[in-house]
């Protein structure tokens, strides 16, 4: 019967009874574990103390001096004076992409696969 991978169902009510021999097998009924002895008040207090510590750290950063106007770069110059040729950068990027495409088109010979 086990050779054809089919389940057999029995109509015998004694074999299918919930209190049959299967009671000793498998998982038993869930046992309630005793609860931890930690009240909600203790948990809230620990969270509040952590929040107070974080607020203290933020207060240290509030005393920053204003930014001096001499430190602000005028004209939107964000490359520290370096001139960027965007056309050349685009060509370089295209060349790199072409190299990646070459790898995708590679088809191994049958001799390479026999190693």
Swiss-Prot record:
Superkingdom assignment: Eukaryota
Protein name listed in UniProt: Histone H2A.Z-specific chaperone chz1
Biased composition (Polar residues): 1-10
Compartment(s): Nucleus
GO CC, alphabetical: nucleus
Organism this protein belongs to: Aspergillus clavatus (strain ATCC 1007 / CBS 513.65 / DSM 816 / NCTC 3887 / NRRL 1 / QM 1276 / 107)
Family note: Belongs to the CHZ1 family.
UniProt biased composition (Acidic residues): 39-62, 96-115
Function: Forms a chaperone-bound H2A.Z-H2B complex that acts as a source for SWR1 complex-dependent H2A to H2A.Z histone replacement in chromatin.
UniProt xrefs under InterPro entries: Histone_chaperone_domain_CHZ
One Pfam family named in its UniProt record: CHZ
Biased composition (Basic and acidic residues): 22-32, 82-95
Keyword Chaperone: yes
Compositional bias annotation for Low complexity: 11-21
Oligomer and partners: Forms a heterotrimer with H2A.Z-H2B, stabilizing the association of the histone dimer. Also, with a lower affinity, forms a heterotrimer with H2A-H2B.
